[in-house]
């Protein structure tokens, strides 16, 4: 009796242990998750995964997280393919409208945690992809997973964990692990990680400026692996450091490590055996789950593989590929039977799938104790001089108008931006009248924030398009949600050569960085004393601006107000005060910037090695980040002046471009300064034409030289074009509202006459204002005068700072 009791107790203990280790009792309850959508493509993958789940002996329940729209559910046939938890579809992002189905994975996991009753009774979670075949039980603690230390497979191509990308998206770049595919973690860790996984996926997906292959490892540069980075960056934010393995999950077609038996196959990549091959993307719309007795093309048999491949290691890899394909087909056979399909006819292949040989090949693979190989920490040490803190987010702005003149500049700017590695997002501030917007064709040229045009001032009627820059910045600040810490403000007529970052150029809150505009002599004379309380704080800067967002919020309105103030002060347009050789007030916006910053005592760090004008001799050793082609520049007989292309549509005419600059071999060989100057000028010209070429290619223009393009080339006869444009330059500059040389050909008298012709009433009002102002001031202006002038602009619609 005593022995019977002992035997019963031992048996109970054994059963208890086995139950624990099978994932059925706390604290060893395992739950497996995988995410899919309502598509045939995911249905056949689900059949394969579910069949392998049952064959492998994986402990615990499994749940399919099914993301479907309401319309998809109406016609969906696969509800019975797996235990299912329905989750909202975010394939089309509910806020941004971005089409990115991969985001459904973190959305589904988070929704399951928040709304599933099953999630309340789980200790460990294994997360897989649908395109996987399980070969043996995946037990988290056997893999080495602990609370706070998840287990994951190695994804070596996630290079963003080692470069700029990680510093932009997490405060803990040192914790970023290149992992994915196979994930096993404690439920408590998943609860912390899941919302971060989703939010970081959204962040990376929206950071289109950093989808480039060199930063992400994505060969397509389309941001498709944003969800993978969302996981790694989210885990880093959560403080989770993974135990990483590189041999338990294998891609069919790869050779397994000697002595290692993979427990998971991931058939995300094409694989082949002899003349047979399989690519999952070839079956994107495949109805194979619902077509009775139809299978994927049968692969070779094991004995054929043994004949064709003498190398034992490679042969073992091919056998794994066979197993993957055969398991998929075996699952389809069983699914067809459940669907009520007639019994299939006998074939040699069906006979093999039911054979003892195949059963032995697919017997569950169990991990040997101590066989799990954990990789050492593979983070690359940062360079000694690299910024040690967390990189702040950056947003780049540039201002344009609804004209083809700004459109070709935008094309050049955006092309260079994508190549430069500039961090963060970018926004074009597009100032348009309602009428111009109706006919505008360049909406797709850049991420755009639309701004009401102030080219014609709403109160004074003054024509001054340059005011759109500060007005647009004010509008952007008041009408968008901005999560960037720093803003980089550039001009459209620029070409980026490299990143412009606050950490490299030492910008800080209260200390913006800019480039020198030495011709702003008004900072040193009466002009500054007339327009700012702090003339000693006036910096002669412009072009490139790096500023903290909080500084910009305080400063932007001053920039706009001071621009209006200087523009209205026509008495002081003289070049001896402003440095403007045309004496037209055209650089009022530049002074508006400097005087506005001075009002706040916002002093700049001035860096002369960020920007260069093509045609200028570079400083020795300077690594310029920006070309500013606002002035004419030449190399030999070739020249470029942006003003000559004001009325030429280079964007909507296929293959239109600028005259090609000379070859670099044609530049000065003896004088190194002149050689470097010319090489930079050539680079700028080449970059503009390169941008135009790619633009026309994206627009699907017919091949150059075809009949449809012969008559639209604008750059075949360089001499003729330059001659025609030179002859018409006076008319062009006089008729264009945004011409930078308006003042050269328009005296104050002509302006008054033109205004009178437009509106006699307006003329009388303006003259009354002018005369009343002259009676009320002497040769100098006091603080009261300035305050009065500011008040006169308080109803522009841009002064609401709430």
UniProtKB/Swiss-Prot annotation:
The keyword Methyltransferase does not apply. One of its GO terms (molecular function) is glycosyltransferase activity. InterPro entries: HPAT-like, HPAT/SRGT1-like. Glycans are attached at residues 214, 275, 425, 637. Disruption phenotype: Reduced root hair length. Longer roots and larger leaves. Residues 792-802 have a biased composition (Polar residues). This is Peptidyl serine alpha-galactosyltransferase. The gene is SERGT1.
């Amino acid at each position: 009796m005593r022995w019977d009791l002992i035997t019963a107790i031992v048996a109970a203990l054994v059963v208890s242990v086995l139950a624990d280790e099978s994932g059925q009792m706390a604290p060893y309850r395992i739950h497996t998750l995988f995410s899919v959508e309502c598509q045939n493509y995911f249905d056949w993958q689900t059949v394969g995964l579910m069949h392998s789940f049952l064959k492998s002996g994986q402990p615990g329940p499994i749940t399919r997280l099914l993301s479907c729209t309401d319309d998809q559910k109406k016609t969906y046939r696969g509800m019975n393919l797996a235990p299912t938890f329905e989750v909202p579809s975010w394939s089309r992002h509910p806020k941004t409208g971005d089409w990115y189905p991969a985001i459904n994975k973190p959305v589904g996991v988070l929704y399951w945690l928040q709304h599933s009753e099953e999630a309340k009774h789980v200790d460990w979670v294994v997360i897989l992809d649908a395109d996987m075949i399980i070969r043996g039980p995946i037990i988290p603690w056997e893999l080495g997973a602990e609370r706070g230390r998840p287990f994951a497979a190695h994804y070596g191509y996630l290079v963003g964990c080692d470069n700029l990308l990680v510093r932009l998206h997490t405060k803990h770049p040192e914790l970023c692990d290149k992992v994915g595919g196979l994930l096993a973690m404690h439920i408590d860790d998943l609860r912390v990680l899941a919302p971060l996984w989703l939010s970081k996926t959204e962040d990376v997906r929206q950071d289109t400026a950093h989808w480039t292959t060199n930063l992400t490892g994505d060969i397509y540069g389309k941001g498709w692996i944003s969800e993978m980075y969302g996981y790694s960056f989210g885990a880093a934010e959560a403080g989770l450091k993974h135990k990483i393995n590189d041999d338990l999950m294998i891609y069919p077609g790869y050779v397994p490590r000697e002595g290692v038996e993979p427990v998971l196959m991931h058939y995300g990549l094409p694989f082949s055996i002899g003349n047979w091959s399989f690519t999952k993307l070839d079956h994107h719309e495949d109805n194979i789950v619902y077509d009775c007795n139809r299978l994927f093309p049968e692969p070779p048999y094991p004995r054929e593989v043994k004949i064709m491949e003498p190398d034992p290691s490679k042969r073992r890899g091919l056998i794994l590929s066979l197993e993957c394909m055969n398991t998929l087909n075996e699952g389809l056979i069983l699914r067809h039977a459940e669907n009520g399909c007639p019994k299939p006819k006998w074939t040699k292949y069906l006979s093999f799938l039911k054979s003892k040989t195949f059963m032995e090949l697919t017997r569950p693979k169990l991990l040997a104790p101590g066989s799990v190989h954990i990789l050492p920490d593979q983070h690359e040490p940062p360079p000694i001089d690299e910024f040690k803190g967390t990189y702040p987010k950056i947003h780049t702005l540039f201002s344009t108008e609804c004209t083809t003149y700004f459109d070709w500049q935008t094309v050049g700017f955006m092309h260079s931006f994508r190549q430069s590695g500039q961090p963060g997002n970018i926004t074009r501030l597009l100032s348009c009248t309602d009428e111009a917007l109706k006919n505008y064709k360049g909406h797709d040229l850049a991420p755009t924030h639309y701004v009401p045009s102030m080219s014609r001032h709403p109160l004074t009627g003054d024509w001054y398009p340059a005011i759109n820059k500060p007005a647009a910045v004010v509008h952007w600040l008041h009408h968008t949600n901005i999560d960037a810490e720093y803003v980089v403000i550039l001009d459209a007529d620029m070409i980026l050569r490299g990143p412009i970052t606050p950490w490299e150029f030492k910008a800080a809150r209260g200390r913006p960085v800019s480039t020198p505009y030495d011709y702003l002599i008004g900072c040193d004379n009466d002009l500054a004393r007339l327009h700012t309380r702090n003339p000693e704080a006036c910096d002669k800067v412009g072009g490139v601006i790096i500023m903290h967002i909080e500084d910009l919020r305080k400063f932007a309105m001053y920039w706009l107000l001071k621009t209006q103030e200087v523009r209205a002060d026509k008495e002081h347009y003289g070049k001896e005060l402003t440095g403007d050789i045309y004496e037209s007030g055209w650089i009022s916006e530049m002074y508006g910037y400097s005087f506005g910053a001075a009002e706040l005592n916002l002093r700049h760090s001035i860096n002369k090695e960020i920007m260069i004008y093509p045609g200028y001799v570079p400083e020795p050793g300077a690594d310029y980040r920006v070309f500013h082609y606002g002035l004419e520049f030449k190399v030999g007989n070739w020249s470029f002046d942006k003003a000559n292309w004001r009325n030429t549509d280079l964007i909507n005419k296929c293959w239109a471009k600028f005259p090609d600059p000379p070859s670099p071999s044609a530049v000065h060989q003896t004088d190194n300064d002149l050689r470097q100057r010319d090489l930079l000028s050539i680079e700028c010209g080449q970059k503009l034409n390169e941008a135009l070429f790619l633009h026309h290619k994206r627009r699907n223009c017919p091949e150059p030289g075809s009949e449809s393009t012969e008559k639209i080339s604008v750059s075949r006869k360089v001499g003729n074009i330059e001659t025609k444009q030179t002859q018409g330059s006076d008319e062009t500059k006089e008729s264009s509202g945004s011409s930078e040389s308006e003042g050269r050909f328009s005296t104050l008298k002509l302006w008054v006459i033109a205004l009178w012709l437009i509106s006699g009433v307006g003329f009388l009002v303006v003259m009354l204002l002018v005369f009343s102002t002259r009676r009320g001031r002497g040769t100098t202006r006091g603080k009261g005068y300035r305050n009065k002038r500011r008040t006169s602009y308080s109803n522009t619609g841009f002064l609401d700072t709430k």
